[in-house]
C-alpha cells in the first residue's frame, strides 16, 4: 500500500482514495509573470513523478495544476513591458509549457486559469460574507480569521502564536482590518489595474481564493491530494483550508503534500535572492532529462543542493542508464531475479515516493543487466521503471558503416589479426562508439 507523508498530521498515512481506483490531485501551479527557475521546476517534476507512480499502480489520475494569471506581479510586469495583462501572462504560460515539456512532464488533465473563474470566485466570496466568515471594508473583502477555530493547523501553529507575530505589523490594510491576520478575498480596483464588477464594487480576487474556487469547481468539496512547494504551507494553503472549509463545512483535502526546495549554498533558490537559473536558460546547455534526473536524486520532501557537479553527475549517471538500455538482448539469459528488483523498487516508491531509494534500485538493476541478464522481459520492465521518472530512451540504431566496422573487427579478432582489430576499435572510439568484448560477444555503448 502507498504511504504518504501528510503535512496536516505530520505523519505517514495509508493512501485511501475517495473513489476506489481513482486519484484527484490539485497542485498549485505558477504565477505567470516570468520564466520558471529550477526551484519552481522541483514541484512540477516531483508531482509529475508521483502522478506517474499512481498510474503505474493502476490508478486513474485526474491531475489539475492551475495558472495564476491575476496577480500584483503580473500587473506590474505587464505595465513595465507595455502589454495588457492577458497577453503578458499568455507569453509566460506558453514558455512554461515548453519548459516542462522539455523536462518530460506529462500534460495536466486541466490547467485552469483564474480569469476563467471570476463569476465563481465572486459567488464563493458572497457565501463567505453571508455566513459572516468574511466582511467588506472600503471595497475590499477580508476573511475573518477569528471565526476559523482551527486556523493554521496545517502549519502546526495556533492563532495565538500568529497574533503575537503579527502584532507589530502596521500597514494601510491593518487600519481597516478587524484582525492583522485577516486576509484579502477581494481587492478593490486601483487606477489602471485590470478589474471586474462585483457586489463590493470593481476589483479583483486575492491570491488564496483563486485556488480554492478552481479546486472545488473541478473536484467538488473534498479532494484526495493537494500539493505544492513547502513555502505554500503558510499562508497560502493555510488560507485555502480556512476559506474552503468555512464555505462547505467539509474537509478540503484528505492529504497535503509539500516538496522541498532547491538550494544554492544552503539557501533557497528564489527570484527575490537572485540566486536562480531559469529552466529556459539551463536547457540551452543541459538536456531536459538530465535536469529532471538531477531533481529526482532526493526524496521529494528533502532539499536538493544545486551545483554544477551535481548536474554533471546526473548527466554521467543518465548516460550509463542509457547505455544499459541499449545493450543487445540475450534471450537465453537468466532473468529470474527480475521480480526482486521490481519488488524493491515498489517498496521504495510506496514509502512516500522515495525516488532516491528508487533510483538506487534502478542502478542495482542496471549493474545486474550489465552482468549478462538482459532479456526482452527485463528491457521492458527497465523501461517501465525509468518512465516513472519521466526518462524515456529511444532505441539506438548504428549506422551501417559502423556496424560493418564492428563486423570487420570481429573477423580480425577471429583471425588473430589484433593490430587491425585495435585500429578499428580506436577508429570507432573517435566516433564515440566504445566496444566491450565479453564471453557473450561484443557490446557497444555510445560514449
Curated annotation (Swiss-Prot):
- One Pfam match, given by its short name, reads tRNA-synt_1e
Protein's cellular compartments: Cytoplasm
Q: Which InterPro entries match?
A: Cys-tRNA-ligase, Cys-tRNA-synt_Ia_DALR, Cys-tRNA/MSH_ligase, CysS_C, Rossmann-like_a/b/a_fold, tRNA-synt_1_cat_dom, tRNAsynth_Ia_anticodon-bd
EC class: ligase
Task: Locate the residues binding ATP.
Answer: 271
Q: What does the record give as EC number?
A: 6.1.1.16
Tell me where the sequence motif 'HIGH' region sits in this chain: 30-40
CDD domains found in the cross-reference section: CysRS_core (cd00672)
Biological process per Gene Ontology, one example term = cysteinyl-tRNA aminoacylation
- Keyword terms of this UniProt record: Aminoacyl-tRNA synthetase, ATP-binding, Cytoplasm, Ligase, Metal-binding, Nucleotide-binding, Protein biosynthesis, Zinc
Identify the main location. Answer: cytoplasm
The protein's matches in Gene3D superfamilies, at most eight in alphabetical order, are given as: Anticodon-binding domain of a subclass of class I aminoacyl-tRNA synthetases, HUPs
Keyword set includes Lipid biosynthesis:
no
**Family annotation (SUPFAM superfamilies):** Anticodon-binding domain of a subclass of class I aminoacyl-tRNA synthetases, Nucleotidylyl transferase
Cofactor(s) essential for the protein: Zn(2+)
What is the free-text note on the cofactor? Binds 1 zinc ion per subunit.
| Substrates-to-products reaction catalysed | tRNA(Cys) + L-cysteine + ATP = L-cysteinyl-tRNA(Cys) + AMP + diphosphate
Positions that bind Zn(2+)? 28, 211, 236, 240
Q: Which positions does the motif 'KMSKS' region occupy?
A: 268-272
Q: Which family does it belong to?
A: Belongs to the class-I aminoacyl-tRNA synthetase family.
The record's subunit annotation is: Monomer.
Q: What is this protein called?
A: Cysteine--tRNA ligase
To which species is this protein native?
Answer: Streptococcus agalactiae serotype Ia (strain ATCC 27591 / A909 / CDC SS700)
Upper classification of the source organism reads: Bacteria, Bacillati, Bacillota, Bacilli, Lactobacillales
User: Gene that codes for this?
Assistant: cysS
Amino acid at each position: 500500500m502507498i504511504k504518504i507523508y501528510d503535512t496536516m498530521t505530520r505523519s505517514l498515512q495509508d493512501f485511501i482514495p475517495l473513489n476506489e481506483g481513482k486519484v484527484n490531485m490539485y497542485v498549485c501551479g505558477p504565477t505567470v509573470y516570468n520564466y520558471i527557475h529550477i526551484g519552481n521546476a522541483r514541484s512540477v517534476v516531483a508531482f509529475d513523478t508521483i502522478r506517474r507512480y499512481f498510474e503505474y499502480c493502476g490508478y486513474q489520475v485526474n491531475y489539475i495544476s492551475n495558472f495564476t494569471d491575476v496577480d500584483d506581479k503580473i500587473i506590474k510586469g505587464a505595465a513595465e513591458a507595455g502589454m495588457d495583462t492577458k497577453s503578458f501572462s499568455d507569453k509566460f504560460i506558453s514558455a512554461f509549457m515548453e519548459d516542462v515539456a522539455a523536462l518530460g512532464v506529462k500534460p495536466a488533465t486541466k490547467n485552469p486559469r483564474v480569469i476563467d473563474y471570476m463569476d465563481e470566485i465572486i459567488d464563493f466570496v458572497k457565501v463567505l460574507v453571508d455566513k459572516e466568515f468574511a466582511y467588506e471594508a472600503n471595497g475590499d473583502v477580508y476573511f475573518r480569521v477569528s471565526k476559523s477555530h482551527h486556523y493554521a493547523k496545517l502549519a502546526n501553529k495556533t492563532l495565538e502564536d500568529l497574533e503575537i507575530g503579527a502584532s507589530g505589523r502596521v500597514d494601510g490594510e491593518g487600519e481597516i482590518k478587524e484582525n492583522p491576520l485577516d486576509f484579502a478575498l477581494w481587492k478593490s480596483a486601483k487606477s489602471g489595474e485590470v478589474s471586474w464588477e462585483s457586489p463590493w464594487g470593481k476589483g479583483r480576487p486575492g491570491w488564496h481564493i483563486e485556488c480554492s474556487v478552481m479546486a472545488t469547481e473541478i473536484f467538488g468539496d473534498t479532494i484526495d491530494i493537494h500539493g505544492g512547494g513547502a513555502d505554500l504551507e503558510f499562508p497560502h494553503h493555510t488560507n485555502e483550508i480556512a476559506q474552503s472549509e468555512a464555505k462547505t463545512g467539509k474537509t478540503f483535502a484528505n492529504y497535503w503534500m509539500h516538496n522541498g526546495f532547491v538550494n544554492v549554498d544552503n539557501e533557497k533558490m528564489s527570484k527575490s535572492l537572485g540566486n536562480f537559473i531559469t529552466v529556459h536558460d539551463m536547457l540551452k546547455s543541459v538536456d531536459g532529462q538530465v535536469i529532471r534526473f538531477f531533481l529526482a536524486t532526493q526524496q521529494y520532501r528533502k532539499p536538493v543542493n544545486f551545483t554544477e557537479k551535481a548536474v554533471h553527475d546526473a548527466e554521467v549517471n543518465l548516460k550509463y542508464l542509457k547505455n544499459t538500455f541499449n545493450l543487445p538482448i540475450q534471450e537465453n539469459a537468466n532473468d529470474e531475479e527480475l521480480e526482486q528488483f521490481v519488488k524493491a523498487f515498489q517498496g521504495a516508491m510506496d514509502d512516500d515516493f522515495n525516488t532516491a531509494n528508487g533510483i538506487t534500485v534502478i542502478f542495482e538493476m542496471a549493474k545486474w543487466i550489465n552482468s549478462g541478464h538482459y532479456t526482452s522481459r527485463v528491457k521492458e520492465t527497465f523501461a517501465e521503471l525509468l518512465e516513472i521518472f519521466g526518462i524515456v530512451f529511444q532505441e539506438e540504431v548504428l549506422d551501417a558503416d559502423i556496424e560493418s566496422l564492428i563486423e570487420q573487427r570481429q573477423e580480425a579478432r577471429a583471425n588473430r589479426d589484433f593490430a587491425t582489430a585495435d585500429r578499428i576499435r580506436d577508429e570507432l572510439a573517435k566516433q564515440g562508439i566504445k566496444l566491450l568484448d565479453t564471453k557473450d560477444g561484443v557490446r557497444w555503448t555510445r560514449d
